């Protein structure tokens, strides 16, 4: 990509929000993933619902969904969008790793990649916040876009 291809800059080389007025509305979907590593006791207590602050996964799920809907308030050049679906799921390895996956969908003029990435990031931060008293060494890693569909650029799938 050439420097001139960057769309978030105006002629004065200052930031701008991209004009999507003439773009067609299409179904757009994005899936993102993040992993949080923790000690075995922390994961076991999360899964057993034994964290003093409450149901960690339920709170993280709601936080991730809320984050997807509020992305344009956090990321300056993101367009406000009408989210038609936001879902968060969790998968653990039974030891020290919890994987968070988000799926965000809209019918609109711009994609939802940032919404999906924001959702998993905030869900992971919520888990950290709720468990930091017992495990300050948790690590949030491997946050990435898994897949996106729709729009002019078509389908993207991350390499496995």
Curated annotation (Swiss-Prot):
NCBIfam families: moaC (TIGR00581), PRK09364.1 (NF006870). It catalyses: (8S)-3',8-cyclo-7,8-dihydroguanosine 5'-triphosphate = cyclic pyranopterin phosphate + diphosphate. Substrate binds at residues 77-79, 114-115. Homohexamer; trimer of dimers. GO terms for biological process: Mo-molybdopterin cofactor biosynthetic process. Keywords: Lyase, Molybdenum cofactor biosynthesis. It comes from Listeria monocytogenes serotype 4a (strain HCC23). Catalyzes the conversion of (8S)-3',8-cyclo-7,8-dihydroguanosine 5'-triphosphate to cyclic pyranopterin monophosphate (cPMP). The gene is moaC. InterPro entries: MoaC, MoaC_bact/euk, MoaC_sf, MoCo_biosynth_MoaA/MoaC, Mopterin_CF_biosynth-C_dom. This is Cyclic pyranopterin monophosphate synthase. Belongs to the MoaC family.
């Amino acid at each position: 990509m050439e420097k001139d291809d960057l769309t978030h800059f105006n002629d004065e080389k200052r930031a701008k929000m991209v004009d999507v007025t003439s773009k067609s509305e299409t179904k757009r979907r994005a899936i993102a993933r993040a992993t949080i590593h923790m000690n075995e006791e922390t994961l076991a207590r999360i899964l057993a619902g034994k964290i003093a602050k409450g149901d960690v996964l339920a709170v993280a799920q709601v936080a991730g969904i809320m984050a997807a809907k509020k992305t344009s308030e956090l990321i300056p050049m993101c367009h406000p969008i009408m989210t038609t679906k936001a879902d968060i799921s969790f998968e653990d390895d039974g030891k020290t790793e919890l994987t968070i996956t988000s799926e965000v969908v809209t019918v609109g003029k711009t994609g939802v990649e940032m919404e999906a990435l924001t959702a998993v990031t905030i869900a992971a931060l919520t888990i950290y916040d709720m468990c930091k008293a017992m495990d300050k060494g948790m690590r949030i890693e491997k946050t990435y876009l898994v897949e996106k569909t729709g729009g002019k650029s078509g389908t993207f799938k991350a390499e496995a």
